[in-house]
């Protein structure tokens, strides 16, 4: 069974927030997944849609798969490096702000007939 893969790395959204979106489309048909993403009011839908479209394009171009028969076999989010920033506080103190990044991986496969 052939599978096509796409990875978006260093996406500047917290992995926790991206996982909320990713969990909605795991195991779904690609067209259904894109429709779900279109109507989900979360900021993470934009990079997830982009990487899903990239996986579909990879399937079509590299493996000659039928784009209408593709399903999202795997989709997961890993934590990337954290950017550390400082927020000044009262009396000369400082708090650390952690700007988290995500790596989004999508694997699509062609659904078998029957």
UniProtKB/Swiss-Prot annotation:
PANTHER family: CHLOROPLAST 50S RIBOSOMAL PROTEIN L22-RELATED, LARGE RIBOSOMAL SUBUNIT PROTEIN UL22M. Transmembrane segments: none annotated. HAMAP family: Ribosomal_uL22_B. One of its GO terms (molecular function) is rRNA binding. This is Large ribosomal subunit protein uL22. This protein binds specifically to 23S rRNA; its binding is stimulated by other ribosomal proteins, e.g. L4, L17, and L20. It is important during the early stages of 50S assembly. It makes multiple contacts with different domains of the 23S rRNA in the assembled 50S subunit and ribosome. Keywords: Ribonucleoprotein, Ribosomal protein, RNA-binding, rRNA-binding. InterPro entries: Ribosomal_uL22, Ribosomal_uL22_bac/chlpt-type, Ribosomal_uL22_bac/org-type, Ribosomal_uL22_CS, Ribosomal_uL22_sf. One of its GO terms (cellular component) is cytosolic large ribosomal subunit. Signal peptide: none annotated. One of its GO terms (biological process) is translation. The gene is rplV. It comes from the Bacteria.
């Amino acid at each position: 069974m052939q599978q096509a893969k796409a990875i978006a790395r260093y996406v500047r959204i917290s992995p926790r927030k991206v996982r909320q979106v990713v969990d909605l489309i795991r195991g779904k048909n690609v067209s259904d997944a894109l429709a779900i993403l279109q109507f989900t009011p979360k900021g993470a839908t934009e990079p997830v849609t982009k990487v899903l479209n990239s996986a579909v394009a990879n399937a079509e171009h590299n493996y000659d798969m039928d784009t209408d028969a593709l399903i999202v076999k795997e989709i997961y989010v890993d934590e990337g490096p954290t950017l550390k920033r400082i927020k000044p506080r009262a009396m000369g103190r400082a708090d650390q702000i952690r700007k988290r990044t995500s790596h989004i991986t999508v694997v699509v496969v062609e659904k078998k007939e029957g």
